[in-house]
C-alpha cells in the first residue's frame, strides 16, 4: 500500500516554511508517514543507500531538518508527525528540548502492548524497545512532554492476556490521548494475506471499549495537572460552541478554550487554565 520512502530536498522545505511565515503563518507541521526515517543528500535520495554507504557525506537527517525550520524565526511554531518508535532518535529529542518553538509533543504510535502481536503486525520493535523510547522522551524532553498514541485491538489471534498487555502499557505511559480502533481486514495487506481474522467482532468491540475507558481516565488525570498553570497559546479560531470564546492549542497539543478579550486569531496569548474535562482545557487570558 506504500511506495519506496523518499525524502524531499530540505532546502526547498526550509524555503517554503520561510515563505509561509513571511505571509503570516504562525505554525507549520512537518508531515510524513514516518518523519524520523528522513535522510537526504545531494548525492542520493535513497534511505537504504544512505544508511549503508560510508562514502556519502553531508547527509541531512530529520533532526537536522527540524533544526533548520526551528531557526527560521522563534515565533514560528513547528510540529511534526508521525514518528516511528524504531526510528525516532535522541537527536530529535534534543532539538525539541533546545528550541521553544518546536512543540513539546510527540505522536508515537504503539499499536499494541504485546511483543508477539507487534511482531505479527510487522512493527519492527517490541514492548521493551517502545518503553525505552518513552523513557528517553521523558528524560530528555521532560515529563511534561505531550505524548499520544495509536492502538489497534483485536488483531489476528490476540488473546485476552495480550489485550491486557496493551492496557498495562497504557498504565505505564499515561498518554495524553490516543486514537483507538478495533482491527478490520484491509485487502492486499500482509495481515490480510497471512493471518485469519479470528477474533470475534463482539470481543473486538468489548476490548476497544476497555482501552477507550482507560484512555479517557488517563486524559482527564493528565489534564487536571494543567489546572492553575499558564500556557502560551496560539489562537486558532472561534470556539465551535460559542462565538464569545476562542480556541487554540498549547505546545503540548492540548485544546484550550477561553473568552475572547480582544485576542486576535493568529497571535499568541498567555492563558491560565481554570478547569478541564478529558478532552479540553478551559481558561482565561492573563
Annotate each PLM feature.
Residues 1-11:
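Canonical Radical SAM [4Fe-4S] cluster-binding loop centered on the CxxxCxxC motif
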Residues 9-27:
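Small-residue (G/A/S/T)-rich helix-start motifs and N-terminal tracts that mark the onset
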Residues 13, 30, 80, 108, ...:
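Conserved, mostly hydrophobic/aromatic
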Residues 22-161, 171:
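Conserved SAM/AdoMet-binding glycine-rich loop
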Residues 32, 82-84, 110-112, 149-153, ...:
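Active-site proximal loops enriched in glycine and acidic residues that flank catalytic Cys/His/Asp
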Residues 165-211:
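C-terminal, non-catalytic macromolecule-binding modules
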Residues 191-286:
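Terminal RNA-binding accessory module
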Amino acid at each position: 500500500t506504500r511506495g519506496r520512502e523518499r525524502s524531499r530536498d530540505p532546502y526547498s522545505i526550509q524555503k517554503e516554511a520561510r515563505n509561509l511565515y513571511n505571509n503570516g503563518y504562525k505554525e507549520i507541521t512537518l508531515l510524513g508517514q514516518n518523519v524520523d526515517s528522513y535522510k537526504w543528500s545531494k548525492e542520493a535520495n535513497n534511505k537504504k543507500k544512505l544508511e549503508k554507504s560510508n562514502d556519502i557525506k553531508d547527509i541531512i537527517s530529520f533532526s537536522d531538518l527540524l533544526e533548520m525550520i526551528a531557526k527560521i524565526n522563534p515565533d514560528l511554531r513547528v510540529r511534526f508527525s508521525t514518528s516511528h518508535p524504531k526510528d525516532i532518535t535522541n537527536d530529535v529529542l534534543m532539538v525539541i528540548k533546545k528550541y521553544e518553538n518546536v512543540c513539546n509533543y510527540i505522536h508515537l504510535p504503539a499499536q499494541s502492548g504485546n511483543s508477539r502481536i507487534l511482531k505479527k503486525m510487522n512493527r519492527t520493535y517490541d514492548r521493551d524497545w517502545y518503553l525505552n523510547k518513552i523513557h528517553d522522551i521523558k528524560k530528555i524532553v521532560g515529563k511534561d512532554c505531550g505524548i499520544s498514541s495509536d492502538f489497534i485491538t483485536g488483531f489476528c489471534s490476540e488473546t485476552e492476556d495480550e489485550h491486557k498487555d496493551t492496557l498495562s502499557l497504557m498504565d505505564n505511559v499515561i498518554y495524553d490521548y490516543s486514537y483507538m480502533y478495533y482491527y478490520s481486514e484491509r485487502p492486499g495487506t500482509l495481515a490480510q494475506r497471512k493471518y485469519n481474522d479470528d477474533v470475534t467482532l463482539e470481543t473486538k468491540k468489548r476490548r476497544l471499549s476497555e482501552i477507550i475507558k482507560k484512555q479517557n481516565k488517563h486524559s482527564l488525570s493528565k489534564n487536571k495537572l494543567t489546572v492553575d498553570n499558564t500556557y502560551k497559546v496560539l489562537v486558532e479560531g472561534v470556539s465551535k460552541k460559542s462565538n464569545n470564546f476562542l480556541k487554540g492549542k498549547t505546545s503540548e497539543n492540548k485544546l484550550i478554550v477561553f473568552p475572547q478579550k480582544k485576542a486576535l486569531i493568529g497571535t499568541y496569548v498567555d492563558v491560565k487554565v481554570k478547569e478541564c474535562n478529558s478532552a479540553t482545557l478551559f481558561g482565561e487570558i492573563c
